[in-house]
């Protein structure tokens, strides 16, 4: 069976109803792993590197339902993009919001783009930074975002897909401060902007944005040219002896 051209998804922390407990949505900010825990300590003997027990987190952050792998519920931003693509001429069979637990089912040779919705992908939000002592520990937000990207890359390799992976939504600014993750996750582009990323900035331009992605028009787009659609910046980061690059896309619809 052919796979869709465009696959949209989000990690577990953004796809959970949290058992209907409103404040539980902050639970993703909780520390998951302490990589520096003393292996001779009492807590290491009980929990290993876990801080907040995973069994507790997974109970509260329960899975949202799916229908044959398609997410029944999804973040509003993803629904906006989905609706925009259908409005702009993409066929229903070519666009899917995949449940993160079934992402492998939808990535294949026909897949052109995988888009992820990210609010706190690297655990740099203010609440998360407080709970993790400034990222000395790994939050569940970061833990499950990393898991999602590793699964996407594994699915691409297994299924022979050359899909471009893009990240969007309000947390994409965090990649500026940990650019090594751009390389680790294999991100082709990062969609950022003042209003929160993947949906508001391309509202009314969803089809054009994905046409550009699929056609390769973001490869060498002139960042200094004022235009009525998108602006691309190729950023370079030095981290010790390593150099990283990131392709950042902004919606460019200003007077």
Give the predicted meaning of each segment:
Residues 1-192, 242-245:
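A short, structured N-terminal alpha-helical element that caps or precedes a catalytic domain
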Residues 186-225:
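Two-component system phosphotransfer/interaction surface
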Residues 120-134, 196-198, 203-207, 253-255:
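Conserved radical SAM core fold
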Residues 171, 204, 250:
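Active-site-proximal loop/turn and secondary-structure-junction residues that shape catalytic pockets
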Residues 29, 135, 197-198, 205, ...:
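Intrinsically disordered, low-complexity regions
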Residues 219, 223-255:
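Radical SAM [4Fe-4S] cluster-binding motif and immediate context
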């Amino acid at each position: 069976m052919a796979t869709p051209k465009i696959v949209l998804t989000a990690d577990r922390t953004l796809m959970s109803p949290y058992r209907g407990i409103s404040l539980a949505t902050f639970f993703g900010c909780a520390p998951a792993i302490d990589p520096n825990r003393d292996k001779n300590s009492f807590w290491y003997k009980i929990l290993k590197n876990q801080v907040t027990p995973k069994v507790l987190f997974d109970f509260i952050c329960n899975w949202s339902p799916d229908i044959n792998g398609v997410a029944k519920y999804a973040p509003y931003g993803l629904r906006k993009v989905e609706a925009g693509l259908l409005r702009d001429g993409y066929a229903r069979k070519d666009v899917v919001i995949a449940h993160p637990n079934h992402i492998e089912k939808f990535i294949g040779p026909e897949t052109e783009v995988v888009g992820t919705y990210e609010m706190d992908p690297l655990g740099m939000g203010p609440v998360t930074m407080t709970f993790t002592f400034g990222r000395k520990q790994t939050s569940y937000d970061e833990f499950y975002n990393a898991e999602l990207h590793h699964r996407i890359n594994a699915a691409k390799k297994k299924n022979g897909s050359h899909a471009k992976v893009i990240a969007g939504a309000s947390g994409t600014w965090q990649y500026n401060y940990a650019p090594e993750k751009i390389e680790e996750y294999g991100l082709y582009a990062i969609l950022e902007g003042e209003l929160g990323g993947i949906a508001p900035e391309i509202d009314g331009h969803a089809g054009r944005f994905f046409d550009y992605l699929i056609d390769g028009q973001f490869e060498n787009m002139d960042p200094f040219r004022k235009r009525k659609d998108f602006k691309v910046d190729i950023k370079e980061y030095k981290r010790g002896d390593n150099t990283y690059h990131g392709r950042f896309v902004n919606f460019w619809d200003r007077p």
